[in-house]
Design a protein with these regions (language model features):
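C-terminal motif of bacterial Sec signal peptides marking the signal peptidase cleavage site
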Residues: 19-22
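Bacterial signal peptide processing site
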Residues: 24-27
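Extracytoplasmic "Venus flytrap"
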Residues: 33-55, 72-76, 173-175
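Short helix-initiation/N-cap motifs at beta->coil->alpha
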Residues: 48, 70-82, 194-206
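Short, polar/charged alpha-helical segment
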Residues: 48-67, 89, 182-186
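Ligand-binding pocket segment of bilobal, Venus flytrap-like solute-binding proteins
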Residues: 90, 166-236
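Ligand-binding "clamshell"
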Residues: 103-111, 116-131, 210, 224-238
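A conserved helix-loop-strand patch within extracytoplasmic ligand-binding domains
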Residues: 112-168, 251, 270-274
């Protein structure tokens, strides 16, 4: 997720201009201990998967009686992390590998548990903690056309060596990233690979379908990653780090809200899967539904509301 999303990051603007300060909320009913006070400010990055996840967690908390204010579609970590540190934002669903690499400029370790520990240590000085990570991931996945995979025996990224020529299409940042084209040449040692800049996903898919390019990166939760027209190549040399979804929450909120709050959040994370998120992303991006509506449906289906 995160490493190819510069093309989706809006220009940074002043935090004050976005009005990130939490708004108060009234409730005539007496609140249970840990559930009163100012709303919890739940944020998201500016892409579909993040917005859906933020809605899922926000609605789950509201169903448990916690007041919530949403600040969605905000932009990049450059904006959001300072606001988490200051307490203006208090909760965001993160992606472990990207948070480590893009948020702190560090190399992620190669497993989800290790990443969780690594990210927790990096966030600790900012007064931010992590709750349980989910099985769901939103990471770079590399797809080829299914007929090409079948005819050439392509199942892994390493198998691209079988081809005379490999053309990878991606955003301009892909060319120099070890998780993208540079990884094909430096990690997988492909000498038959060339790069073609295609900024947006739609034209990239069109180029793949027409045979103009061989392979493209997509998000693992995108409809293309699960489409039978394509084959997602296994990252057999672990070029791309794990990107498990993990709620990042300010320590102040965790201390104030207590164990029941953490349990409510962890119950949501325990139900999230990559396949499930792919379906929700399709409903928003392809079918035109609203993130809040698909989040509500999912929570109901999972028995969480």
């Amino acid at each position: 997720v995160g490493w190819t999303r510069n093309i989706r990051v809006a220009a940074l603007v002043a935090v004050a201009a976005l009005g990130l300060t939490a708004c108060g909320g009234g409730d005539d009913k007496p609140a249970a201990a840990g559930k009163g006070g100012a709303p919890i400010v739940v944020a998201s990055f500016n892409f579909t998967d993040s917005q859906i996840l933020a809605e899922i967690y926000a609605q789950a908390l509201e169903a448990k009686g916690y007041p919530v204010t949403r600040k969605l579609n905000l932009g990049s970590r450059e904006l959001i992390y300072p606001s988490l540190k200051s307490g203006e934002l208090q909760f965001i669903p993160e992606y472990q590998g990207s948070a480590i690499a893009a948020g702190f400029g560090k190399d992620p370790v190669k497993d989800a548990k290790g990443e969780h520990e690594q990210l927790a240590k990096l966030l600790e000085p900012s007064g931010v903690s992590l709750l349980d990570y989910a099985a769901a991931e939103d990471k770079n996945t590399y797809i080829v056309k299914a007929d090409l995979a079948q005819s050439k025996g392509l199942a892994t990224i390493s198998d691209l060596k079988k081809l005379d020529k490999v053309v990878l299409a991606g955003g301009p940042e892909c060319e120099k990233r070890l998780t993208c084209f540079k990884g094909l040449t430096d990690v997988y040692k492909l000498t038959n690979a060339t790069f073609q800049t295609v900024q947006e996903l739609g034209p990239r898919v069109q180029q793949l379908d027409s045979g103009g390019v061989t392979v493209i990166p997509v998000d693992s939760v995108s409809p293309q990653a699960g489409d039978s027209k394509y084959v997602a190549l296994k990252d057999d040399l672990s070029m791309v780090p794990t990107e498990n979804v993990v709620p990042a929450v300010t320590k102040k909120v965790l201390d104030e809200r207590g164990a029941d709050f953490a349990a409510a959040v962890n119950a949501v994370s325990a139900k999230l899967t990559t396949e499930g998120m792919r379906d929700l992303n399709k409903r928003v991006d392809s079918d035109g539904e609203k993130a809040a509506d698909v989040a509500k449906d999912w929570l109901s289906q999972q028995g969480l509301v």
